[in-house]
């Protein structure tokens, strides 16, 4: 920014491990925000902050879709061109399975994008969408890292080159699992949010609750066997993370179905 009052300098620049296009370093922040650019909360500042945070998390799939699509295209092309014992790599069954995992990630991310487009507009108040926002941010970034790892595996020795897309994608996707809330924390918050709603509705069975929850009522039936158990109080945090992962996948599958 050319205005000295709004300029944020970088006093120390770090050597990035990845994401080379983004400057990474120490920024002392001492700025004056113009009156017409300030955010004025209708009630508490907490609600305004949550609205901004959830909107940011809901828009993660837009980044993830292009990332996963590029990895899917590159990996598919490589497996078609690479010849092993006289046959393309893609003819190997385990390779087909790995490619299908990237394709599944792309499908799930596409469903997330459709939901986000309908939901994350500036005209909507997103302060109450913590479960859905955490689901999109955590799962799509996990899918990005998983797709990158698969692409690196399929690329073989070439993937270990510093300038190869597979190796770079592993490093570049990793920070997104950590910042804006580490994914383990977000999965735990998803589980905590659902258990709180279950107590409020006096429902003990996870499947019964998700069958009536707005963003899982269509998809829960596909996972009845896995979800048909009761959630009691005092769940260890490590188990909350696991339950949150399960719930995130059920909710995301509904976005695909819709």
Predicted regions and their residues:
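Extended amphipathic alpha-helical segments enriched in small hydrophobics
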Residues: 57-123, 219-257
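Short alpha-helical scaffolding segments that buttress acidic/His motifs in well-ordered protein cores
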Residues: 49, 116, 170-173
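Contiguous mid-protein beta-loop-alpha structural module that forms a pocket-lining wall or clamp
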Residues: 112, 144-151, 156-161, 169
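C-terminal helix-coil-helix/basic helical segment that borders enzyme active sites and/or dimer interfaces
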Residues: 107-139, 152-153
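A conserved active-site cap/scaffold subdomain adjacent to cofactor or substrate pockets
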Residues: 54, 61-65, 76, 105, ...
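Short beta-alpha connecting loops at secondary-structure transitions
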Residues: 97, 128-135, 171-178
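Glycine-rich phosphate/cofactor-binding loops in nucleotide/flavin-utilizing enzymes
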Residues: 157-225, 235-236
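FAD-binding core of flavoproteins
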Residues: 1-60, 198-238, 242-245
């Amino acid at each position: 920014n050319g205005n000295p009052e709004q300029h944020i300098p970088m006093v120390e620049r770090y050597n990035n491990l990845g994401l080379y296009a983004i400057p990474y370093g120490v920024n002392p922040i001492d700025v004056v925000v113009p009156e017409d650019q300030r955010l004025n909360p209708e009630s508490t500042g907490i609600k305004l902050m949550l609205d901004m945070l959830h909107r940011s998390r809901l828009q993660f799939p837009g980044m993830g879709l292009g990332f996963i699509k590029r990895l899917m295209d590159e990996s598919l092309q490589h497996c078609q061109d690479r010849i092993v014992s006289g046959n393309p790599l893609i003819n190997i069954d385990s390779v087909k399975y790995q490619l299908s995992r990237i394709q599944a990630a792309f499908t799930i991310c596409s469903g997330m994008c459709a939901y986000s487009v309908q939901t994350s507009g500036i005209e909507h108040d997103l302060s109450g969408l913590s479960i859905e926002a955490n689901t999109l941010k955590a799962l799509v970034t996990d899918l990005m890292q998983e797709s990158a790892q698969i692409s690196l595996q399929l690329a073989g020795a070439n993937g270990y080159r510093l300038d190869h897309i597979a190796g770079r994608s592993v490093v570049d996707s990793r920070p997104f699992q950590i910042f804006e809330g580490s994914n383990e924390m977000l999965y735990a918050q998803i589980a905590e949010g659902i258990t709180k709603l279950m107590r409020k509705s006096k429902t003990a069975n996870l499947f019964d609750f998700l069958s009536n929850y707005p963003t899982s009522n269509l998809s829960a039936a596909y996972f009845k066997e896995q979800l048909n158990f009761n959630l009691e109080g005092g769940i260890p945090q490590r188990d909350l993370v696991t339950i949150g992962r399960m719930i995130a996948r059920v909710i995301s599958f509904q976005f695909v179905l819709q």
